[in-house]
Amino acid sequence: MYRVVRRLLFLTPPERIHTLVFAMLRCVTSIAVLRRLLRWVLGPTDPVLASTVFGVRFPGPLGLAAGFDKDGMGLLAWGALGFGYAEVGTVTAYPQPGNPAPRMFRLPADRALLNRMGFNNNGAGALAIQLAHHRPEVPIGVNISKTKATPASHTVDDYRASARLVGPLASYLVVNVSSPNTPGLRDLQAVESLRAILLGVLAETSVPVLVKIAPDISDSEIDDITDLAVELRLAGIVATNTTVSRDCLVTPGIDALGAGGISGPPVARRAVEVLRRLYGRVGDRLVLISVGGIETADDAWDRITAGASLLQGYTGFIYGGGFWPKHIHDGIARRLHDGGFASLRDAVGSATAKSE
């Protein structure tokens, strides 16, 4: 059924249909009785899916990835739609319009998206107001990054300002230094630059802090960031952001679309490689959140058994539809029961343990 609906939705430009569908979701879930009904139908209800991660209780491991709800306008929607949590943002200290449109494109033959949104958002102050005025039913993380207009010399202060505004209202914070759509941002993944940013954010908030990394960095850079995260006692790492690689894409005319980060199945292989490397280096000393190319319950299960405590999706939601979170959670629950696992936590990294 959703295939037919998706075909119709895809007749409209991506950013336009995103705005329309998001408005509809907010409207429906603004009604308490409908919100409760949706959560009863779609929500992760099996207790085996619940886990406590960095002191936060998650009813299910699959969350909405950053980028869909940039300004926290749908805080009440995500639990009702079956997600175990949501990460809102990316938000910057100051409002900014992002890059010129068109800036989002579908790659249907790859079941992928290409975006160069450029962190369009209303600013951390506006998001703080949203967070203060709503009580979501699931944990809400906030993804923060640098305002494009902020000089490099004030980068740390920019991140600190965002952390100061939204930190007290978030379940956790993610420091984003890995988007390909802000000039120079990925350079901040260099350890000495990243150290200063993370120390600044940690000084501003008491909530768990994670860092989000790119799939396109080298293995040695991954190791350096991982060691820094352990040294600074971060809560964890989100892996990975979108990729700039165009390898193996089959959608015609991709070069004509211009620059941007690609999400969905084309990033899946590298996302798994990064996850396995991270878990092999730190085990359970850091919480690992895996994102990138998760489409099916099998994909989700592979990430969990490879070491991910939590998962995120965005492109899978676009291509999979409103029942996608439920299908993923139901599939994970079934595999937990079939495998004799008493809890989700028991399954995390289990494939790695068996291979040793």
Swiss-Prot record:
One Pfam family, short name: DHO_dh
Bilayer disposition of the protein: Peripheral membrane protein
Enzyme Commission numbers on file: 1.3.5.2
Cell compartments where the protein resides: Cell membrane
Pathway membership: Pyrimidine metabolism; UMP biosynthesis via de novo pathway; orotate from (S)-dihydroorotate (quinone route): step 1/1
Top enzyme class: oxidoreductase
Main location: membrane
Cofactor(s) named in the record: FMN
Residues that coordinate or bind FMN: A66, G67, F68, D69, K70, T90, N143, N176, K212, T240, G264, G293, Y314, T315
Any one GO molecular function term: dihydroorotate dehydrogenase (quinone) activity
Entry annotation: catalytic residues: S179 (nucleophile)
Cofactor note: Binds 1 FMN per subunit.
Keywords assigned by UniProt, alphabetized: Cell membrane, Flavoprotein, FMN, Membrane, Oxidoreductase, Pyrimidine biosynthesis
Cellular component, GO annotation: cytoplasm; plasma membrane
Record text on subunit structure and interactions: Monomer.
Function: Catalyzes the conversion of dihydroorotate to orotate with quinone as electron acceptor.
Family: Belongs to the dihydroorotate dehydrogenase family. Type 2 subfamily.
Name listed for the protein in its UniProt record: Dihydroorotate dehydrogenase (quinone)
Organism annotation: Mycobacterium leprae (strain TN)
Gene designation: pyrD
